[in-house]
Amino acid sequence: MAKQDYYELLGISRSADEKEIKRAYKKLAMQYHPDRTKGDKEKEEKFKEIQEAYEVLNDKEKRAAYDQYGHAAFEQGTGFGGGSFGGADFGDIFGDMFGDIFGGGGRGRQRVVRGDDLRYDIEITLEEAVKGTTKDIKIHTLAPCDTCHGTGAEAGSKVETCPHCHGAGRLRRQQGFFVTEQPCHFCHGTGKKIEKPCKTCHGDGRVNKAKNLSVKIPAGVDTGNQLRLSGEGAAGENGAPAGDLYVVIHVKEHHIFERDGSNLYCEVPISFTMAALGGEIEVPTLDGRVKLKIPEETQTGKLFRMRGKGVTSTRSGYAGDLTCRIIVETPVKLNEEQKELLRKLEESLEGQTKQRPKSSSFLDGVKRFFDDLTK
């Protein structure tokens, strides 16, 4: 039976680089490894073919020969080893694979575990969100121990490499091609053997501390935005880099404005006489009061847009708009004289539908509705 093309077998293109070849092999090896397929002969053969393909394509010389001559390059008498595939270090492949799972992949390297990232939720006003501000915050985190300066050992105490894991902080166990890893229980994963642990941090090298920070919040932020403060998270183990602090923004509700992205909305009440006769009013913006001209015969719900009076976008740098929705207020607590004036106004408008456009439109619609019912 003809052999399957090595590139097709690994599911990669002929231009695949070393990393792509290794990634494809890892994925397939995990799927077809005998320890997982539990005696399935067909999958066991498939695993052998995958190993064979990997050794050829991962070797520059063998790959070049395969690209030129195909499988014939490795037949007896061709000078390329007669089809023997025993040279690849598959322990390294599986070691890397499980090293990723357990926090590191190299042999003999001390484990480097970056510190945890932290989250801090902060509440600001709309004005602060629009214009930017600086806030002082206090967080509780793991910081390097001041007593031992992060070493975990008392002054003058010996710190040696763990003789069991040789400083890696992990112990490996290999059965055939299958490799497992677990933290070294002799040094508790630190890779070190400390003669006298620091009494302050008990050998960890880190202690819980309160830390004060000043956070600069840029103009234009909105609820849900995150600010990353690099290196302000928890300290890492064994002198590893600290994690980051993520400050999550929450903008308080405003008593006047509603926000939608870069745009602002507000409701502006006016008297019914101004709505009828027109006039000029002052409306609030985040930059102060501005004048708005109300035309005659303005109805409730009419929208006025004030360009550039919204929020400046952090991405585009352009300011949004402020949209004002007019609310015509009905007067309350009228005296008899005022009520009489309104009655006279109502009488004077009786039958003049052109002066009451909304009422006219509504009544016409009602009439058509009932006319349709009686047909």
UniProtKB/Swiss-Prot annotation:
All copies of the J domain together span 5-70
Coiled coil (UniProt feature): none
Q: Which GO terms describe its cellular component?
A: cytoplasm
Q: Write out the GO biological process terms.
A: chaperone cofactor-dependent protein refolding; DNA replication; protein refolding; response to heat
Q: Where are the CXXCXGXG motif repeats?
A: 145-152, 162-169, 184-191, 198-205
Where does this protein hold Zn(2+) 2? C162, C165, C184, C187
The subcellular localization recorded is: Cytoplasm
Q: Which cofactor(s) does the record list?
A: Zn(2+)
Q: Which HAMAP family did the record assign?
A: DnaJ
Q: What is the name of this protein?
A: Chaperone protein DnaJ
Q: What organism is listed for this UniProt entry? A: Aggregatibacter actinomycetemcomitans
- State which gene encodes it: dnaJ
